[in-house]
Amino acid sequence: MRDLEKQFHESAAWEQRPKPTTTAPEPRDLDLKDSSVLIEKIQQMYDVLRLALESDSTRLITLFLSFTTPPLKLPGVTQDTHNLTHHGGSPEALAQLEIIERAGLAKFSGLLDGLKTAQEQGAPLLDRTMVLFGSVMGDANTHNNANFPLLLAGGGFKHGQHLAFDKTNNTPLANIYVSMLQRLGIGSEKFATSNGTMRGLEMA
């Protein structure tokens, strides 16, 4: 009970603490019915996300991105994204998916660069922020929700590596959440279907 009371007092103090200011322009409203602006909208969302962390307006953000739209107005893309994910191995469809995913990942890379440039207490904000990026499908072509591709950046973990696991007897996805909770200082040994922490994920 005492720990909970301390959390309430800390939250109240945080509300009264002066927040950093920004000179960033106010985001302009975009019409999502126009498929040409989806990538720009993603850029806006990442900009707002970064500013929220920089200003200490929040410490936790969840962002869901949906590419289920009419064909994006990107060079080389002629079909809508959802149909392309059911590619059936078609080289043409896979090539178009690559164009879309490269455009989206370029914006994600910009988010990481922005967090790396921003400073908090003398350290890059990225070093003090865990950023988990992933998909709701391991293979959208077959609606297979196993073997999710995930990217974890920042947070003081050792990066620059690719961890792969047995596809038939895989490591539970929830293990990475246990590792992240422990990095946050939450002494949790279990989350959902986890059976430990994420093997191979170490602190820098």
Over which residues does each language-model region extend?
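Ligand-binding pockets and gating/stacking loops
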Residues: M1-A204
